Amino acid sequence: MMVSHERRVLFVHVQKTGGSTIDRMLEEAIPDVTYLQGLRGGRHARLAPALKAHPELKEYFIFGFVRNPWARMYSWYAMMRRAETQAAEGNAKAAKQLAKNRLWKRVLPNYPDFESFVLRGPNEQRELRRAQITYLRGQGRRADFIGRQENFDADLQKVWDRIGLEWPGESLKVNTGPSADYRQHYTDEMRDKVAEVFAKDLKRFKYEF
């Protein structure tokens, strides 16, 4: 979660929705932007506890992004496995990520494949069952703008226009993995499990498999 008091803007970073790119672009565009400290969840803190700790931020422009839940779950698992492979090959950055990320340290040894990650993970790991919409509301407030990862540049440009920044022409590409059709990695049971876990997101954002 990043905040700029100069621009009066708060960015809520939902995992695997393009947030690392937004973090980097905000840092390059706004001199005073910084991570909001002291919140559970760190970079991925939810709006509710942030506003409880800092009620003055209710007056800021608040935005975040969401993503198709099936695509998001596949991207999340693939990122963890990719980091594991890179660390084993001697990549120091990946090794550091693995060492400090509590969720990754729970996931990688316990879910040997994507199927177990989907079918068991949400039941056993709170972070994996939290609907995206729950990050973006709380304390009587909702995000002013919710963009979609599927329409990333166009939606992010709307944010830049809203907070008075010059759009650079296109977004940066940070932490992007190889593109793949997530559907081919799902069985019917896995598809239905994600639909059950993220029913609130499907209802709110009208995503389909």
Which functions belong to the PLM regions below?
Residues M1-F209:
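Membrane-interface amphipathic segments in extracytoplasmic regions
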